[in-house]
């Protein structure tokens, strides 16, 4: 891969991770508001849903940012985007919800692309792979 490809993949991962890092941090710091939103959306077990949301969004966002376990994390975040679109943004008669729904579908496409092609050379996945190769060569 060329350096520009790796730079592009890094920028893409950073941009994909931002939404989750920001949203997950807001959920982490505001559990009552997040759980109230979940109640309004009709979710059961709002405390468990809050924990799951924080783990997926902050953990997945950090993993995507640093390119760690990128392919499986890409699949998890793609599924998360579809699930949240269907649960929280399915009222497409409301223009704002329609925009959020299709934003999530677009993010799903980005995460599927990352799941298919990986993080690139500028990632912890690539570093770990190089380390394994160096250890195997010793």
Name the predicted role of every residue range.
Residues 1-29, 47-55, 59, 65-138:
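Extended, low-polarity transmembrane helix blocks
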Residues 31-43:
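Short juxtamembrane and helix-loop transition motifs at transmembrane-helix boundaries
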């Amino acid at each position: 891969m060329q350096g520009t490809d790796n730079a592009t993949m890094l920028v893409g991962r950073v941009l994909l991770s931002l939404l989750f890092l920001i949203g997950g941090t807001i959920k982490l710091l505001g559990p009552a508001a997040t759980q109230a939103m979940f109640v309004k959306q009709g979710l059961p077990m709002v405390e468990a849903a809050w924990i799951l949301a924080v783990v997926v969004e902050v953990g997945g966002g950090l993993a995507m940012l640093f390119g760690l376990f990128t392919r499986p994390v890409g699949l998890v975040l793609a599924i998360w985007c579809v699930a949240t679109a269907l649960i929280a943004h399915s009222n497409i008669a409301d223009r704002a919800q329609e925009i959020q729904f299709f934003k999530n579908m677009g993010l799903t496409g980005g995460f599927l692309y990352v799941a298919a092609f990986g993080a690139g050379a500028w990632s912890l996945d690539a570093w770990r792979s190089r380390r394994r190769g160096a250890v195997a060569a010793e």
